[in-house]
């Protein structure tokens, strides 16, 4: 968020990728939306569309879930390329164009996308143009033996539920705080050597 980039999280289902992003939205107090990418998801389901209002006899814009500050594109590689491409303008320009009108998105803006490994059934490879828009990719693997044993014990003794409660998390900052951090990061000098 401070660097202004987007993140791709990769791992098999069930490792907590979605919970991680929901938790991030909570502690940063950002507007948060989640889109579950599926094979039948259409581009307008992501960005929104113009809708005719019979009462006013005019078109009105129905904003899609991409109109937010923190967007979770869950299992992005389960949707066909046409739907994945709906995020290209969102990620690069931080705007959405509907019926020729451009809508600027609120800052800070970040897409956190999860994807399943390509060897999983029902997945599509992300196009190069989309991969280029991610600042980095994080690989999430199965927990080690000790961590998995600890998780099993938490399930058995009932303490796991409290650990998974996103609503119990306290905000650490907000959009203004993030914007201030971003401004400070612009002043960091990087040695050419």
Task: Please report, for each region that a protein language model flagged, where it lies by residue.
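A short helix-turn-beta junction within AAA+ P-loop NTPase domains corresponding to the substrate/partner-engaging
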Residues: 30, 124-141, 159-162
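Conserved AAA+/SF3 P-loop NTPase catalytic/coupling segment centered on the Walker-B
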Residues: 67-92, 121-130, 142-151
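Walker A/P-loop
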Residues: 2-38
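AAA+/P-loop NTPase substrate/partner-engagement loops
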Residues: 27-55
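Basic, amphipathic alpha-helical bundle interface domains used for macromolecular binding and assembly
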Residues: 159-193
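P-loop (Walker A) phosphate-binding loop of NTP-binding proteins
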Residues: 12, 46, 114
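Conserved AAA+ ATPase "SRH/arginine-finger" region at the nucleotide-binding site
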Residues: 36-41, 136-147, 167-169
């Amino acid at each position: 968020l401070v660097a202004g980039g987007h993140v791709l999280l990769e791992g098999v289902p069930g490792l907590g990728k979605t919970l991680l992003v929901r938790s991030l939205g909570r502690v940063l107090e950002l507007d948060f939306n989640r889109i579950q990418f599926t094979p039948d998801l259409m581009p307008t389901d992501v960005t929104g569309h113009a809708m005719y209002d019979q009462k006013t006899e005019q078109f009105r814009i129905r904003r899609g879930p991409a109109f937010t500050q923190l967007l979770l594109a869950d299992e992005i590689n389960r949707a066909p390329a046409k739907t994945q491409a709906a995020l290209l303008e969102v990620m690069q320009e931080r705007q959405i164009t509907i019926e020729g009108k451009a809508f600027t998105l609120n800052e800070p803006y970040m897409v956190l996308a999860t994807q399943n490994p390509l060897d999983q059934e029902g997945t599509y490879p992300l196009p190069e143009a989309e991969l280029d828009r991610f600042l980095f990719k994080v690989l999430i693997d199965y927990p080690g033996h000790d961590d998995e044993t600890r998780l099993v014990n938490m399930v058995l003794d009932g303490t796991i539920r409290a650990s998974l409660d996103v609503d119990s998390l306290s905000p650490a900052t907000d959009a203004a705080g993030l914007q201030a951090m971003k401004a400070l990061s612009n002043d960091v000098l990087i040695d050419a050597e």
